[in-house]
């Protein structure tokens, strides 16, 4: 579930952004953006010149200088406004999160158990390791792990999802988040963070972006823009002696206007806004990124590790067939399978019970009346079952049952091996059922591949992204599902160590890897991956290891995360192309106007046939300011994104933003020149 999206130009945000734009006129704020700092200095210089001209202290056209000065200030203000609007949208999202963080008291237990004596303390004084009790109606005061109890928890304030979730001690559902509310029962929680370090605190700090650090690509682009600015600054400085030597020195106001129009002010004014907006779009998808670096890395990812269950398949495997071993009838197998599944509350376990009912009218037995001992599934044993009336029935993976049979002095039948292979080749998961040391047969669990997922993987392949399916299934089952889903590769019988080794292998090849995870056993791989999306429903260890948290706990979101990252990089690249292409058109407007009096041959460059030198220069400066405003929606929303190969994407962007960057200024400057002339302003 995504959060409610703010309108692009929300009136309250626009008003606040205008105020912030004025505040950002101070030198300290401007210094952070070297390109716009040059414009700020030019604005200050031309303001002083126009005042001197108006007072008679300097010769020249005071009105023209004042007009140039005014539009240079407007250019700075528009750049400030773009950044302030992006920050304002993020802060509005942060304010909604701050509403969750309430000052409250907590019941700090003196001993780590329910019923122990408790002290009432302010929630913001709780430290890592403190034990607290929360009951129905209470706000959970800190991030932590449930060490006792189980409760229904409303996490809508954090995730936006209205359905309550169960949090209980043990397993992967023991992690709780401060600011969420207990709906029923009680929990004893051990705080896992100190004040100011909670998940909610980190969300607010990230969203507000007050300490937002530039990403590597952003730093590289800033260095390029500074280099271009220095080149144009030196070029402009040398033009004054050339014009003076020709006998008609160009005014400082015109030189400043020329410099501002030539340096890449468009991308310089929008660069910060693009970065802030990228993180804001990620939050709009209900994904919290720890830094802009993580969002940027998502755009460079070329390997996706995707869990099979829930991402590639629907995740609710259903029993579809009972396949008895040689000498065993199907009803005997179904009866044993149903008994072994009576206490199994997983979707797979319930489907086995239902299939036995449907096929052989085997009604579900009363668990209490059986006087049986149920054996739960564990990651170590990889099987579950029941002990009843001297019968020991188990169901589980092929390898686990094989070890169990051999440990009990039995022999695993060759015909069952063949049946297991047959089930696996069909893309189903085989579960083997055994009674004592006698193998009864195989249950086929069919998992359904999601509709349209094959087409999405084909699009990712076009973009040069390799998809790898991660599954605990055996190789035959994994190969069948991988072929059906259209992934490029797969890792079968995956263990945490195997995932980690696979990530390191791809990284050694120079690739960037993205993955999702939710369990403590995923933490090492999440920490190693370049883009690691932890599920909000997962453990604290997983969330700390990842550099993003998906509030919806939807593994499929990884594809959307990559989409947003690539869109941010494309937006930055497209607007940089547009900005640099702009300079060519402005060159044709200003150079003839500024130097035609000294060098008449330059009139040949006046292909736009602008009204006069003054109108040409002023039109270029006005266009330079207005284009920033027109591009703000594109910077905030991102450019249109289509899954294409790198070369096709480059060609498309060069046509749209390169050619567009050349043509738009020619048209815009000419229109502004006509308006100035018609209105008699020049």
UniProtKB/Swiss-Prot annotation:
GO molecular function: ATP binding; ATP hydrolysis activity; magnesium ion binding; P-type potassium transmembrane transporter activity
Domain of life assignment: Bacteria
Disulfide-bonded cysteines: none
Subcellular location, record wording: Cell inner membrane
Manganese in keyword set: no
UniProt cross-references to CDD domains, sorted A to Z: P-type_ATPase_K (cd02078)
Record's GO cellular component terms: plasma membrane
Residues where Mg(2+) binds: 518, 522
The enzyme's E.C. designation: 7.2.2.6
PANTHER family tied to this protein: POTASSIUM-TRANSPORTING ATPASE ATP-BINDING SUBUNIT
The protein's name in its UniProt record: Potassium-transporting ATPase ATP-binding subunit
